[in-house]
């Protein structure tokens, strides 16, 4: 059957409306693509505060960063894999390695192995606090040790350290830092592990000199082969007279962008962070002063979408001056 003129006009108008609708949907899709999700940590933690600082910086540049709290490192990796609205996460540099060794879920394991680096953030030191007389990691054999909440970065790092050192505590107890310190001061456990940038507020404010507690040096050769050696400087805590050798991990901002659907937005995100670092140092959490975005991280490859966009900010970076963002010593 041949269409009459009115029918042809209606069909043409219908096609035009459909084209406009498709265009509008395309625009809406572009707007949605400017949304990014970032999984961090508990709402009182440094990771979450870093996320909020980034959100404030990015809002003025047209990127809506949605910052999510979490229960810890394992939760972060699972969220990156399983939750489509989350493309970015903050984890410790050894956490993904630990997860690939321990994670039974093959999909999560495969994704963890392939997560690329966006930027390094700052170092976090291993703090092992124990009752007097426990002078090295080996002395924790047969002892009761608190290792953080299950699934947290502290938890996974503690498991890795004891495995590397060949030390088997009588029990590794999962509890948060405040609970662990209360148990340690009461003599119900022998030691606690905390992995965080010094000074850790809890250890600075709640431990007293007459508690009879001290840091345990972390010097086992097998641990030093796998982790970066560092120290907690003398006087970092009021009850700590001498420097203590230990090891550190690095807090990392990582991505999970299956299908590379957010390549351009993550790249633009990276460019804004590079150019906005002086603002973050001035207006954000004090630990932004410790951040060096160009620092290489052993075993990690930066996302090529980040390299592509952030490299266009090199001149801006040099104009700002590296001294302004040199990590504290």
Label every model-predicted segment:
Residues 150-160, 228-298:
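Ligand-binding clefts/hinges and TM-proximal coupling segments of bilobed small-molecule sensing domains
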Residues 93, 104, 167-262:
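Pocket-lining segment of extracytoplasmic ligand-binding domains
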Residues 107-121, 236-244:
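A structural signal for short loop-to-beta-strand junctions that line the ligand-binding cleft
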Residues 68-109, 179-183, 199-207:
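Pocket-flanking alpha-helical
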Residues 17-26:
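Bacterial N-terminal signal peptides
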Residues 35-58, 124-186:
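Bilobed "Venus flytrap"/periplasmic-binding protein-like clamshell domains
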Residues 175, 179-186, 196-209, 215, ...:
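An extracytoplasmic/periplasmic, membrane-proximal ligand-sensing/linker region
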Residues 2-18:
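Bacterial N-terminal signal peptides that target proteins for export
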């Amino acid at each position: 059957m041949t269409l009459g003129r009115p029918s042809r006009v209606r069909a043409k108008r219908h096609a035009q409306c459909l084209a406009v609708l498709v265009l509008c949907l395309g625009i809406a899709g572009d707007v949605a693509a400017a949304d990014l999700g970032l999984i961090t940590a508990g709402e009182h933690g440094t990771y979450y505060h870093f996320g909020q600082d980034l959100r404030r910086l990015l809002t003025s540049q047209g990127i809506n960063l949605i910052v999510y709290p979490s229960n810890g490192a394992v939760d972060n990796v699972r969220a990156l894999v399983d939750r489509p609205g989350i493309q970015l996460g903050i984890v410790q540099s050894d956490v993904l390695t630990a997860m690939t060794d321990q994670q039974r879920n093959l999909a999560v394991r495969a994704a963890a192995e392939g997560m690329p680096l966006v930027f390094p953030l700052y170092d976090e030191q291993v703090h092992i606090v124990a009752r007097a007389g426990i002078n090295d990691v080996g002395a924790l054999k047969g002892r009761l040790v608190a290792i953080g909440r299950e699934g947290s970065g502290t938890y996974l790092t503690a498991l890795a350290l004891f495995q590397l050192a060949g030390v088997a505590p009588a029990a590794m107890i999962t509890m948060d830092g405040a609970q662990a310190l209360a148990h340690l001061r009461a003599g119900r456990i022998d030691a606690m592990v905390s992995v965080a940038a010094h000074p850790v507020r809890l250890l600075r404010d709640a431990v007293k000199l007459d508690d009879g507690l001290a840091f345990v040096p972390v010097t086992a050769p097998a641990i030093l082969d796998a982790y970066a050696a560092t120290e907690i400087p003398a006087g970092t805590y009021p009850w700590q007279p001498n420097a203590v050798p230990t090891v550190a991990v690095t807090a990392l901002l990582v991505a999970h962008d299956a299908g590379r659907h957010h390549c351009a937005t993550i790249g633009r995100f990276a460019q804004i962070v590079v150019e906005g670092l002086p603002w973050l140092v001035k207006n954000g959490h004090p630990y932004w002063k410790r951040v060096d975005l160009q620092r290489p991280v052993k075993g990690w490859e930066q996302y090529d979408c980040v390299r592509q966009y952030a490299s266009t900010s090199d001149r801006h970076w040099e104009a700002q001056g590296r001294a302004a963002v040199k990590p504290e010593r």
